[in-house]
Structure formats: structure tokens, C-alpha cells
A protein has these predicted regions:
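A generic structural signal for well-ordered coil/turn residues at beta-strand boundaries
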Residues: 15, 35-37, 177
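Short, well-ordered beta-strand micro-motif
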Residues: 20, 40-42, 182
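Metallo-beta-lactamase
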Residues: 25-116
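C-terminal regulatory/interaction regions
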Residues: 121-189
Length: 189
């Protein structure tokens, strides 16, 4: 907490646990992926706030779902899919009844895999990241004249490209000091 701008009044533990706050017991579930220190919180009335671990049904058409690290996000969604709570509250819109939650987890995974496969299909030959980004933005009609917004799109595309490299769908090479990405031949099943 030495590097923080403000001193926190309560430090939330960095592991899965029960945590008392103002005399009330909450469950803490570590779910990195969307961000490195992302957590879910379970209230005493058995409601789980999943925050950005998942997209709600209302957001299943997201063009470029954000995750800092897609492999960690998949693991966190699987972990949450094994939990059983009466309801789940999802950031940016949505409450999911507990009985429907496992299907929502599967649908979130399917959306990310679908987007990754679509992005992979846009790389047929060794291609620079800038060109991949341009193709993805054109494909999803993410057209803007605002640099800050285009940087957000670029960030989201980069995390998908990193996922494709990490999982062996794309390989990197260098040419004249520029990193190029090419398909390895591995396909989504």
C-alpha cells in the first residue's frame, strides 16, 4: 500500500476466502483474466457479484470482448462455472439466476473462441500487427476518428493476437525489425 495514492481502509485478501467487512461475512473469489487482480464477491444472501468475469446475455454480441489475458479469463470462467449461488450479478447489465449460470459461462467461452477464430481467419500470410488490427477493425466496423477509442480497439485486438500466439494458432517472426504473425495451421475444433 506504500505506492497507492490513497491508503485503503480495508485490504481485501489476495486468495479465495471469507472476508468480514463491517461485521458482515462476504466470500472472495479470485478471478484474474479481465484484469490481474479481478475478484468476485459473494454476499451473505448467496448472491455472487461476478463483475467483469463474464458478459451478460445482453452483451453476447460484443465485437471485441476485453480480457487482459484470455487464458486466465477462461480458467476464471471455468472456476466460476463450478460455483452454485442463487443469483449472479454481472457488470454492465445483467442478473443471471443460478440455474442459468453454467450455460452463460459456456456461451461466454464460445463467444471468445468465435472471435479468436474470426481474427485468425484474417491472417493468411505473415502480417504485421498493425495490418491485423486494421483488418479486424474493418471487419467489425470499429471505425472511429478518436485516437483514444482506436487505442482501446487496438489493445483488445492485441490481447486476442497474444492468445492466438500463446495457444499455437499464430507464430511470430521478424522481418526488417518488424514482428509478423502467421498461421501455424492449427485450427479451432
Amino acid at each position: 500500500s506504500v505506492c497507492l495514492v490513497h491508503t485503503p481502509d480495508v485490504i481485501i485478501p489476495s486468495e479465495d476466502c471469507n472476508f468480514e467487512f463491517c461485521g458482515v461475512n462476504f466470500g472472495i473469489i479470485q478471478t484474474p483474466g479481465h484484469s490481474s487482480g479481478h475478484i468476485c464477491v459473494v454476499t451473505p444472501d448467496d448472491v455472487c457479484y461476478v463483475a467483469d468475469t463474464l458478459l451478460s446475455r445482453e452483451n453476447q454480441d460484443a465485437k471485441l470482448p476485453y480480457a487482459l489475458h484470455h487464458v486466465a479469463a477462461f480458467a476464471s470462467r471455468r472456476k466460476m462455472g463450478e460455483t452454485r449461488h442463487s443469483h449472479y450479478i454481472i457488470a454492465h447489465k445483467g442478473i443471471c439466476p443460478g440455474a442459468d449460470f453454467p450455460a452463460l459461462v459456456r456461451d461466454n467461452d464460445a463467444l471468445i473462441l468465435r472471435r479468436a477464430e474470426e481474427i485468425l481467419s484474417m491472417v493468411q500470410e505473415p502480417t504485421s500487427f498493425s495490418e491485423i488490427n486494421r483488418r479486424v477493425c474493418a471487419h467489425y466496423k470499429l471505425l472511429t476518428r478518436q485516437p483514444r477509442r482506436s487505442l482501446r480497439f487496438e489493445r483488445n485486438v492485441r490481447f486476442f493476437v497474444e492468445y492466438l500466439v500463446d495457444e499455437g494458432y499464430l507464430e511470430m517472426s521478424c522481418e526488417d525489425g518488424a514482428t509478423l504473425y502467421a498461421p501455424t495451421g492449427k485450427h479451432f475444433t
